[in-house]
């Protein structure tokens, strides 16, 4: 048998059914791996909670087989942005370092109710703001991959702990969040599958807010089939979330047929950057390889234009920063957050927020407050919302002539941990993922191969609203050609 940790979720499920090993044995193997990990992926470990859940899973596997699901006894990790009952939830910020929720977020509850075993909470960029997982009060996360010259690289962000844990075989799958690419970009950097569903497909109840009109739960796994299995239980309408979509959730696994003959795949010219920037050539070559794979399977390739793409990144950072400045205003040390006491209330606010919020979070709060200020609201925030509609309309028009859109996920491979990127360069890591987020569309990142530095490169498939099954199927076709690059 393969190393128990390196099995896919589907393979783990099959072996649990066959009694090749128990859920407790599977869970203990992961606990041992976590205790010895050097990636700094897990920040809160819950071994007793996990073993109790595994014992319950073993009981179901033996005595209540009608209750078995695809995730019964499967060990998973949870990004520390999702509330977990009686388990610390910090968003990796000092201001919430001691916060323990009294309830589970909806998506966590649905995972646990479906039989998944929670191993603990995963590191992330503070309040999900970042592309490298270096903005965490618990320290940076290390990518399991290293460059060919031995240099350590970042896992991406903000779900860097989730992507590193899955790629490093510390858990079978992980829950992440995606606001502008925070599931897809780290998945690309770590060579795994990362899926962001349609906005509203998964409940945001109990998920610590960054930008409420963009935030969406997502999954990170090692295979496309696993992504379908993990996504299934967390979808569905929730009365606790006013943005939750009240529509039926299909069985995603049924959509993975590997049949794409006649499907029209859009290739947006605006995503081709290698003509201007030589450093993006490797990604463009892999993009062409992915196009060829889909052509081989009978798909029709269609050149399309998304003319407002160039505005997406600045629009995104205005909108998400504005929403963050509003959402994070609650952390003042009185109702929420670790308080720094002072005799003067204004000084207390200043010390509490100044000492307990990180540099990137404060930067975005300031950007957002500026964009929302009375003198600049129309010039920045209102205009950004108007352009967001134009970006969305580009996709709506394109989906009248194509079924899916294929792009790179990130412009380059993962960068070195000790590489000091300026803020703008860091933001550019999300240049390909942000447009789909602004439009609220589902998108998946799938590994396509390795760079010359032996680091993962990935492609992104964007689908029409609520067509998660379709993007899973396209990703599965690419996976058929590339295999599992983690091997």
Curated annotation (Swiss-Prot):
Cellular component, GO, one term: glutamyl-tRNA(Gln) amidotransferase complex
What biological-process terms (Gene Ontology) are attached? translation
Reactions listed under catalytic activity? L-glutamyl-tRNA(Gln) + L-glutamine + ATP + H2O = L-glutaminyl-tRNA(Gln) + L-glutamate + ADP + phosphate + H(+)
Q: State the active site.
A: 79 (charge relay system), 158 (charge relay system), 182 (acyl-ester intermediate)
Q: What is its EC number?
A: 6.3.5.7
Q: What does this protein do?
A: Allows the formation of correctly charged Gln-tRNA(Gln) through the transamidation of misacylated Glu-tRNA(Gln) in organisms which lack glutaminyl-tRNA synthetase. The reaction takes place in the presence of glutamine and ATP through an activated gamma-phospho-Glu-tRNA(Gln).
Full protein name: Glutamyl-tRNA(Gln) amidotransferase subunit A
Q: Which SUPFAM superfamilies match?
A: Amidase signature (AS) enzymes
Which source organism does the UniProt entry give? Ehrlichia ruminantium (strain Gardel)
> What are the record keywords, sorted?
ATP-binding, Ligase, Nucleotide-binding, Protein biosynthesis
Q: Which Pfam families match?
A: Amidase
Q: Which GO terms describe its molecular function?
A: ATP binding; glutaminyl-tRNA synthase (glutamine-hydrolyzing) activity
Hey, which family's this protein in?
Belongs to the amidase family. GatA subfamily.
Q: What is its quaternary makeup?
A: Heterotrimer of A, B and C subunits.
């Amino acid at each position: 048998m393969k190393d128990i940790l390196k099995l896919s979720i589907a393979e783990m499920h099959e072996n649990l059914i066959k009694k090749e090993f128990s859920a407790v044995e599977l869970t203990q193997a992961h606990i041992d791996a976590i205790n010895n990990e050097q990636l700094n992926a897990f920040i809160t470990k819950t071994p007793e909670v996990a073993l109790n859940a595994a014992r319950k899973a073993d009981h179901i596997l033996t005595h209540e087989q009608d209750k078995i699901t695809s995730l019964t006894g499967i060990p998973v990790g949870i990004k520390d942005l999702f509330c977990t009952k009686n388990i610390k939830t910090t968003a990796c910020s000092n201001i919430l370092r001691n916060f323990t929720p009294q309830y589970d977020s909806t998506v966590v509850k649905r995972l646990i109710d479906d039989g998944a075993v929670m191993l603990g909470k995963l590191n992330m960029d503070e309040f999900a703001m970042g592309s490298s997982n270096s903005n965490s009060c618990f320290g940076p996360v290390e990518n399991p991959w290293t460059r060919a010259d031995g240099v350590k690289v970042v896992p991406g962000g903000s779900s860097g702990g989730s992507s590193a844990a899955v790629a490093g075989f510390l858990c079978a799958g992980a829950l992440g969040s995606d606001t502008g690419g925070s599931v897809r970009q780290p998945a690309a950097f770590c060579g795994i599958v990362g899926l962001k569903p349609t906005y509203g497909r998964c409940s945001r109840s109990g998920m610590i807010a960054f930008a409420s009109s963009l935030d969406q739960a997502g999954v990170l796994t090692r295979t496309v089939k696993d992504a379908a299995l993990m996504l299934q239980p967390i979808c569905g309408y929730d009365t606790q979330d006013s943005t939750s979509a009240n529509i039926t959730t299909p069985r995603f696994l049924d959509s993975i047929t590997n049949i794409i003959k006649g499907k029209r795949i859009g290739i947006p010219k605006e995503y081709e950057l290698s003509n201007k920037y030589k450093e993006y050539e490797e990604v463009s070559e892999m993009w062409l390889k992915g196009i060829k794979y889909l052509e081989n399977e009978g798909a029709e390739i269609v050149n399309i234009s998304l003319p407002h793409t160039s505005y997406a990144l600045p629009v995104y950072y205005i909108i998400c920063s504005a929403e963050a400045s509003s959402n994070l205003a609650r952390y003042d040390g009185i109702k929420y957050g670790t308080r720094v006491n002072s005799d003067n209330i204004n000084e207390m606010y200043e010390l509490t927020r100044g000492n307990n919020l990180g540099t990137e979070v404060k930067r975005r709060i300031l950007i957002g407050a500026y964009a929302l200020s009375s003198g600049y609201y129309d010039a920045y925030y209102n205009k950004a919302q108007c352009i967001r509609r134009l970006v969305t309309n580009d996709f709506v028009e394109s989906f009248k002539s194509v079924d899916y859109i294929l792009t790179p996920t990130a412009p380059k491979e993962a960068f070195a941990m000790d590489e000091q990127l300026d803020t703008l360069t860091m933001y550019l890591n999300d240049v390909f993922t942000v447009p789909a987020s602004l439009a609220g569309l589902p998108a998946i990142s799938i590994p396509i191969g390795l760079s010359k530095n032996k680091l993962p490169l990935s492609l992104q498939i964007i689908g029409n609203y609520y067509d998660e099954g379709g993007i899973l199927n396209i990703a599965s076709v690419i996976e058929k050609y590339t295999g599992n690059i983690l091997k």
